[in-house]
A protein has these predicted regions:
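Bacterial N-terminal signal peptides that target proteins for export
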Residues: 2-11
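Acidic/His- and Gly-rich active-site-bordering loop/insert found
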Residues: 8, 23-133, 152-161, 340
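Hydrophobic h-region of N-terminal signal peptides that target proteins for export
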Residues: 13-22
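Sec-exported extracytoplasmic/periplasmic mature domains
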Residues: 34-42, 63-71, 147-154, 187-188, ...
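An extended, acidic, His-containing surface patch that forms the Zn2+-binding/catalytic region
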Residues: 76, 92, 204-205, 264-327, ...
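Acidic/histidine-rich catalytic neighborhood of metal-dependent amide-processing enzymes
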Residues: 129-217
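A short core secondary-structure module
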Residues: 176, 180-181, 240-264
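Short amphipathic alpha-helices in soluble, non-transmembrane regions
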Residues: 245, 353-361
């Protein structure tokens, strides 16, 4: 029965794809993105939820709707589901450029489905928006890059240096089977890239109080990350005769200590540059303080760390995300544990974070265990190099009024797996978010405007041309 269902699902997919392929010129870029969003390419740590049929149907869909790209570029599938495109340039002496993306998405929680204006995998299109999981993170990027390549190939464009696209299939769960395997493949080819561009930075509006202009934040670095299980084992027993402290009590006190004593805050070079760039756009008092940063350093750090958003730019942050303990109402818990999700700022390390937690909790009953993969912070790409100039100039040409600033990305991307392949790794997508829409990323009602999606295709088209001309 399961095999029959699988065969019917595949047949349905092939029929739909055949219809799409039959009229490629009449299928707009908006409809192609909408269809791409309908493939539920969901990443989850629970491997039993993985549906290989959906992933393979999505790959087949790309081959049908971008025929020139798949005819003229060398196309390779790595580890069954991750995709590599090789666009041969005319000058073999020039170092290649690499564009990264991923087509897997996070789940839409069942408890939130009624709150969506349109189902998360419907790809619904209205007069203004395209709705669905992946419209910002990150399926839109894969589609926009392939739209750009298809457009340029129709114009008989050939880049001067080699250009690669690499699209992972498991970025949302660490990229260990996708980006990591692709990077290993590139290493066997002895590839080094002049520039790598991934997600991570974004355009923001009305996020910084007092600044009305849109700001393009290009991430020149990203934090490291790790998950730690902090656990306590204590004797069990009946709740009618409790000890002074149960395992949950001990663990709770450890959590409170960590909250009261966060990792130290400091200004890293990208954040200093960002404050210098933004200073002229703030009100008088803020502008004066930022221009005299050394004099007001403590006050600036205090102000920034008091804000939830900017606090993450100045320090390693430790978040409690999952809690376990106890199995029965009247039984004392022998075991209690909490997951600590850590985002590590440049200057800190996995080892220094572990030392901090042990020092602050200061209790031999509290044990720490590193979970799954973990990564130290990335290196920092210079904001005055060729890669930065080409990217920032392309942004400026498309959005003349925009402010452009470096950023330390608080999250992690697939780019961390490529760190040994380039000294110039930048992270940016041409999408604008404000205080409301930023909650839609991994949240409810994820969407992208039709105008902005079309502009993102134009942006990548011009960026590829500019890299070819100026690199």
């Amino acid at each position: 029965m399961q095999q029959l269902k699988t065969n019917l699902f595949l047949l349905k997919g092939v029929l739909l794809l055949s219809i799409a392929a039959a009229q490629p010129e009449r299928t707009s870029e908006i409809q192609r993105l909408s269809k791409a969003l309908q493939f539920e390419t969901i990443s989850d740590y629970d491997s039993s939820t993985f549906n290989p049929v959906v992933y393979k149907n999505f790959i087949y869909y790309l081959q049908q709707v971008f025929p020139l790209t798949h005819q003229k570029l060398e196309f390779r599938i790595i580890n069954e589901y991750s995709l590599v495109y090789y666009w041969k340039g005319t000058d073999a002496k020039r170092a290649p450029a690499l564009f990264l993306g991923h087509y897997d998405v996070v789940p839409a929680e069942a408890s939130t489905l009624k709150q969506w204006s349109h189902p998360p995998f419907s790809g619904y299109i209205d007069n203004e928006w395209i709705w669905g999981r992946g419209t910002i993170d990150n399926k839109f990027l894969v589609m926009a890059l392939l739209e750009s390549a298809e457009k340029l190939l129709k114009e008989n464009f050939t880049p001067r240096q080699d250009i690669y696209f690499a699209f992972g299939h498991d970025e949302e769960i660490g990229g260990e089977q996708g980006a990591l395997k692709v990077a290993e493949y590139f290493k066997t080819k002895n590839l080094e890239f002049d520039m790598i561009l991934d997600e991570g930075g974004i355009m923001v509006k009305d996020v910084f109080p007092g600044i009305t202009k849109t700001i393009a934040l290009i991430a020149t670095a990203e934090k490291g990350d790790m998950n730690i299980e902090m656990s306590v084992f204590e004797k069990g027993g009946h709740s009618s005769v409790p000890p002074k402290e149960t395992s949950i009590d001990v663990l709770s006190k450890a959590i409170l200590k960590l909250n009261k004593h966060p990792m130290p805050a400091r200004l890293q070079q990208p954040t200093i540059e960002m404050l210098n760039i933004l200073a002229p756009h703030f009100d008088g008092k803020t502008r004066f303080a930022l221009r005299h940063r050394r004099l007001f350093r403590k006050k600036i750090i205090k102000k920034l760390t008091d804000n939830q958003g900017t606090n993450a730019l100045l320090r390693t942050v430790i978040s409690t995300t999952m809690l376990r303990g106890g199995s029965k109402e009247n039984s004392l818990p022998t075991f209690a544990a909490v997951n600590l999700n850590v985002r590590i700022l440049q200057g800190d390390s996995i080892e220094s974070v572990m030392q901090h937690i042990y020092k602050i909790t200061n209790d031999p009953r509290v044990q720490l265990t590193l979970k799954r993969s973990y990564h130290n912070p990335s290196s920092i790409t210079l904001s005055n190099g060729k890669a930065w100039q080409v990217l920032s100039n392309t942004i400026k040409e498309n959005w003349p009024d925009i402010i452009i600033s470096p950023l330390v990305a608080p999250g992690t991307t697939d780019s961390r797996h490529y760190s040994s392949l380039s000294k110039n790794i930048l992270r940016f997508i041409p999408v604008t978010v404000d205080n409301e829409s930023k909650e839609q990323i991994h949240g409810i009602n994820e969407r992208i405007s039709i105008i902005e999606y079309r502009k993102s295709i134009l942006f990548y088209t011009e960026l590829i041309k500019k890299i070819s001309a100026e690199f």
